[in-house]
């Protein structure tokens, strides 16, 4: 930790010293009068040199920041689509959705609220942690399976009424 602070201090000293030295050198730069064809001398550090010449066209000047901004925007969009389509991200999103549905079921939220949260019967089945073989079986005394069947019939009736 002490070495880190020493390194940080040394870097700040080196870069701070070079910036102070370059600022004094920059302030002393002068453009000769013969190059300017003007009766007065002016200091380079006092004025902006962008569009200093009347012959430059503002529309033709290249702006580097706009180009960098568009490149960064396309890079972030491609990164976002790549990360969103990656398998680990999708698995994490499915686990998060499953735990969210489990919490809703434990709270005893109504079927209407589950439907409004776009919970599908398959998500409901997974959240109840039922075995896939139970889905097709005729076990009637399993309360979780009965709850699933009730939600599935409710969901299908809502989908039919929404379609008409």
UniProtKB/Swiss-Prot annotation:
Query: Which residues does UniProt call coiled coil?
Result: none
Q: What induces it?
A: Expression is induced during host plant infection.
Report one GO cellular component: host cell plasma membrane
Tell where it localizes: Secreted; Host cell membrane; Host nucleus; Host nucleus, Host nucleolus
Entry keyword Secreted: yes
Entry keyword annotation includes Secreted: yes
Instruction: Identify the stretch annotated as signal peptide in this record.
Output: 1-20
Q: Which UniProt keywords apply?
A: Host cell membrane, Host membrane, Host nucleus, Membrane, Secreted, Signal, Virulence
- Write out the residue ranges of the motif RxLR-dEER: 48-63
Similarity-based family = Belongs to the RxLR effector family.
Its domain comment says: The RxLR-dEER motif acts to carry the protein into the host cell cytoplasm through binding to cell surface phosphatidylinositol-3-phosphate.
Q: What does this protein do?
A: Effector that is involved in host plant infection. Contributes to virulence during the early infection stage, by inhibiting plant defense responses induced by both PAMP-triggered immunity (PTI) and effector-triggered immunity (ETI).
Return the protein name. RxLR effector protein PexRD49
Which species is listed as the source? Phytophthora infestans (strain T30-4) (Potato late blight agent)
Q: Which gene encodes it?
A: PexRD49
